[in-house]
Design a protein with these regions (language model features):
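Class I S-adenosyl-L-methionine
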Residues: 1-201
């Protein structure tokens, strides 16, 4: 499949400025868990960055909604594979989250077909991860289950996690000292690192 056709099918990829590679994003309003947490003071989703700034532009919202609708297209796996192939690093959902178990299974298939790419996916959707054996996840994908509240410890049901610290907390992500970029850090993609702690955005 040509990349032009793949972009038309999927709505294309995003290019987050801090990341070492492209990403796939969905509207934050469609988050199953995040849409509830955004109303909870002290939660990581309160004041969600994906509901502010450039994400509010009409053209950006239109692109996000196109990507959401594209998840139902039977050609989605093939098209996403065509777009990602050849990339060293990929991030799932710099905005948005897993929509269903079928969506997650389709992501697994894309990862299997792009075995030379390292994939990272943060999520708050415990309901779907609890239906998955971590041992069955493609080895080039790391899914980090994110804790819901600021300064909350990591969850204990999943081997890879992420947490968010208040400004005085024990943040491990170096991006704030690196012009808000990953730089040479690849901790989020590294299965040998059980938890990554971010500062509150």
């Amino acid at each position: 499949m040509l990349k032009k056709e793949a972009r038309e099918i999927t709505g294309g990829l995003s290019k987050p400025s801090k990341m070492p590679g492209p990403a796939h994003n969905l509207p934050a309003q469609a988050c199953k868990t995040g849409a509830k947490l955004v109303k909870v003071p002290g939660s990581v989703c309160a004041g969600c960055y994906a509901l502010k700034g450039r994400y509010r532009f009409n053209n950006v919202q239109a692109a996000l909604n196109r990507r959401l609708q594209a998840l139902e297209d039977p050609r989605w796996v093939e098209a996403m594979t065509a777009l990602i192939k050849g990339e060293k690093f990929f991030r799932w959902h710099d905005s948005g989250d897993i929509q269903s178990l079928k969506h997650l299974e389709n992501i697994f298939e894309v990862c299997k077909r792009t075995s030379s790419t390292q994939h990272w996916m943060p999520t708050r959707e415990a309901q779907f991860l609890k239906q998955v054996d971590p041992a069955t996840i493609p080895p080039n994908l790391i899914i980090r289950m994110s804790s819901h509240m600021i300064d909350q410890g990591p969850v204990n049901f999943w081997p890879w996690t992420s947490t968010v610290a208040s400004p005085a907390g024990n943040r491990t992500c170096p991006a704030p000292e690196q012009n808000n970029e990953c730089g040479s850090c690849r901790a989020c993609w590294d299965r040998s690192i059980p938890n990554v702690c971010y500062g509150k955005h």
